[in-house]
């Protein structure tokens, strides 16, 4: 024939779906759902970089999750006390920077018998700032004293007295400071104290969605039904602002290790919202603490008082960064990051490919009821995607699923970021300490460094232990026997 030569009859490939809809809908982790065979044409160009699925039957094998050791963690009340102590150190060194004296001068110069000009300090501002910095500690004490349980009558009376004393003392000190500040300062100056809260209200009102899915298998879903879009008001927004700045002692979510695509996507959606909630709590708490440590004291300084503005800005950055690292380490512990990693492993990921490079390869129509093995090509929204994960139930066009898998596919990613940030902060503080020439800068950096060493030690300890645990799990059994 003029058009080409004749050859033997070619085998026709049946383009059947990869899996039957609903085949993995009710499977549990112990079962192995079978998936129909996947065949591709033999003509695969080596220049495309795409490998077609094997000719044998594809089978979804259950994942083997790593069992991480139980790392010691601080109690919630002890952690809040440690965080408050770090904030007090930062506030103390900032007051040294503002109200320092020249007490070492000889009597011929204007001497001072103290290292600080205490008569220039506004103790009402100091009291208000201390209460704001202690808000999480106060909430933790009240929560510990409010926990019910079978206890003796004297113990119950002691808890009630403790709760009453803490709330009464805090409320009286706060009201007294605010009243005295209204007498000595203008209303415009007092608005500076409420500036962070004024920014949160429109930000929360317009930008955040507090709705959460009602998942029955999640034991500790926060009740956010009152924050529906149709019923948002400023009272509810203020309530959730306070929740962001109060300590969160809720238990960690649990991992529903199942092979149902719908349940896996629902679990990932819930964990994504829970993770965003924890990150928002970290950001809001750290920014508010740094604001009251670095900016509020200098705003109420008299016009004749000199202070180092550059040091105040550096202190704001250092306090916000160190507080963010400490809070993130507490709210995102190793067990929680391992939970997110397991969910990301079940979710999988898709990589968008050029349709021209895989036109001669078998392509399936993506179905949400199916669980797709690694290396399969699917069509979704007129695009072609390749399965990247061990098995994949993510929506190919959903960017949030891609980000979730990218960020949590490595279980040590969050811990590596925190360790790097804390290490860079400590290195910068050590460099500033060695190059400082002023006595108050030396004292300030030395005290702040001591408050960061403990957090860095815990991060390094967790990183070393978890790194060895995940590495031991990743090594095949045959290599372990050889070693």
Curated annotation (Swiss-Prot):
Against InterPro entries, the record matches this protein to: Uncharacterised_TMEM39
Q: How is the protein disposed in the membrane?
A: Multi-pass membrane protein
Per UniProt, subcellular location reads as: Endoplasmic reticulum membrane
Give the residue spans that cross the bilayer: 76-96, 114-134, 158-182, 187-207, 281-301, 414-434, 440-460
Name the glycosylated positions.
Answer: 9
Keywords of the record: Endoplasmic reticulum, Glycoprotein, Membrane, Transmembrane, Transmembrane helix
Give one Pfam hit by family name: Tmp39
User: Does the record bear GTP-binding in its keywords?
Assistant: no
- The answer to whether keyword Endoplasmic reticulum applies is yes
GO CC term, one of those recorded: endoplasmic reticulum membrane
Q: State the similarity comment.
A: Belongs to the TMEM39 family.
Its annotated function is as follows: May protect the cells against DNA damage caused by exposure to the cold-warming stress and facilitates tissue damage repair during the recovery phase.
Q: State what protein this is by name.
A: Transmembrane protein 39B
Question: Which organism is the protein's source?
Answer: Xenopus tropicalis
Q: Which lineage do the record's taxonomy fields give for this organism?
A: Eukaryota, Metazoa, Chordata, Craniata, Vertebrata
- The record's gene field reads tmem39b
